[in-house]
Amino acid sequence: MEQLTARQTEVLQIITRHLETCGYPPTLREIAAQLGISGTLGVMKHLEALEKKGYLRRQEGSTRGITLCNQSQAASLPIVGVVRAGLLHPAIQDIEGHFAIDRSQLASGGAFFLRVKGDSMVHAHIVEGDLALVRPQPHASNRDIVVAMVDGEATLKRFYREADRIRLQPENPNYEPIIIEKGEQEVSIVGKVVGIYRQME
C-alpha cells in the first residue's frame, strides 16, 4: 500500500476507532467534526485518496458506506498519559487518545503508546512528541529501552543491571543516569519500548 499523509492517517484512525467503539463507520460530518473542519468536501477528498491507495472502499449513496480493507489487520492502541524522557514524572495514567497501527507489528496483547516529553533520549533518536510503543513486561535485559517506575514515578531510559544496582541511562550527556541501589528505592519495569512513531509535518 502507498504511504499516507499525516491527514490521511488521521482520517483512517478516526474511522478505525469509530468502527471499534460503535461497530459501524462514521458519517462524513462525524469525520469532519473530529478533524475540526466545518465542511465535508475535504473529508471526501481524503476518503477518495484512501480508496485509491487501497485502505478502504466506499459505497455510493450510503451515509455510512465505508469499509476498511484488511480491517482485521488494524489495531487501535491507547495513548496513555505522558512519560517524561528526562526527569522523573508522575505515574502513567489517563488515556488521551488512540493511534492505529498494523496488527502484525504487535507480538502480544496489552501494548500501548506513551507520548514522550523531554530530550534525554535524543541520541537514541527519541524526541519530544514521539509516541513510544510499549510492550508490557515486568523484566528487562541490559540495553533495553524501558518505561520504568521509580518510587511511583515514570521515566523512559536505557536499562542496565549492575551487581547490586540498576542503572537507568539517558541517551544525552546533559543528563545524569538514575542509579537505584538495592533496597534504596522501589523500581519496577512497566514495559519495553519496541517502536517509536512520529508524525511528520
UniProtKB/Swiss-Prot annotation:
Cleavage (site feature) positions: 85-86
UniProt KW keywords: Autocatalytic cleavage, DNA damage, DNA repair, DNA replication, DNA-binding, Hydrolase, Repressor, SOS response, Transcription, Transcription regulation
Active site annotation, chain numbering: 120 (for autocatalytic cleavage activity), 157 (for autocatalytic cleavage activity)
Biological process annotations from GO: DNA repair; DNA replication; negative regulation of DNA-templated transcription; proteolysis; SOS response
Molecular function terms, GO-annotated: DNA binding; serine-type endopeptidase activity
UniProt-listed Enzyme Commission number(s): 3.4.21.88
Record organism: Citrifermentans bemidjiense (strain ATCC BAA-1014 / DSM 16622 / JCM 12645 / Bem) (Geobacter bemidjiensis)
InterPro entries per the UniProt record, alphabetical: LexA, LexA-like, LexA/Signal_pep-like_sf, LexA_DNA-bd_dom, LexA_repressor, Peptidase_S24_LexA, Peptidase_S24_S26A/B/C, WH-like_DNA-bd_sf
Top-level taxon of origin: Bacteria
DNA-binding region: 28-48
Name of the protein this chain belongs to: LexA repressor
Function: Represses a number of genes involved in the response to DNA damage (SOS response), including recA and lexA. In the presence of single-stranded DNA, RecA interacts with LexA causing an autocatalytic cleavage which disrupts the DNA-binding part of LexA, leading to derepression of the SOS regulon and eventually DNA repair.
Catalytic activity: Hydrolysis of Ala-|-Gly bond in repressor LexA
Oligomer and partners: Homodimer.
CDD domains in alphabetical order: S24_LexA-like
Keyword Hydrolase: yes
